[in-house]
Amino acid sequence: MSHHHEFHATRHIQNILTNSTLKMLEPDGTPLNGIEGVPGVSEIIDSGIEIGADRIIMQPGSAFELHTHPGAHILYVMRAAGFIHVDGVDYEMTEGDTVYVPAQFAHGVKTNPEVDEAFEILSFGVPHLPIDSSERMSVVTHS
């Protein structure tokens, strides 16, 4: 039986509040300013692609410019408030909100300038790429 049909507690239970943070990277490999991530659980599923969830911590004033991901993902706001930018519009996201973003769909995420605390979101995606992978997102050069 393959590994993705088994449960391994040390690998399949991860605390995204206490695990170590990692720098998140631009597609060219440079660290994103003011943004870190905490890896959560991930596993290869039947289709051979990886599923996973990570915590992203955005310091006040930081932003992800317009970008896409290879797969669809769901964002869950854990703390504070921010905005998701879709089709030229900023939509506010507050604690408890869940947002679905289709695969290859251009979007941006930024903090709320009126909120002086870190904006924390849970990003759950398929396929999943490691939090510190420079291939996690592709920047969109035009809107």
Residue ranges with predicted function:
Residues 103-131:
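Ligand-binding loop in jelly-roll beta-barrel domains
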Residues 43-45, 63-69, 110-112:
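Short histidine-centered beta-strand/loop micro-motifs
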Residues 57-59, 68-84, 124-126:
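Short, conserved beta-strand element in jelly-roll/cupin
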Residues 1-50, 136-143:
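A short, N-terminal "cap"/entry segment at the start of jelly-roll beta-barrel domains
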Residues 88-104:
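Short acidic-glycine-tyrosine-enriched beta hairpin
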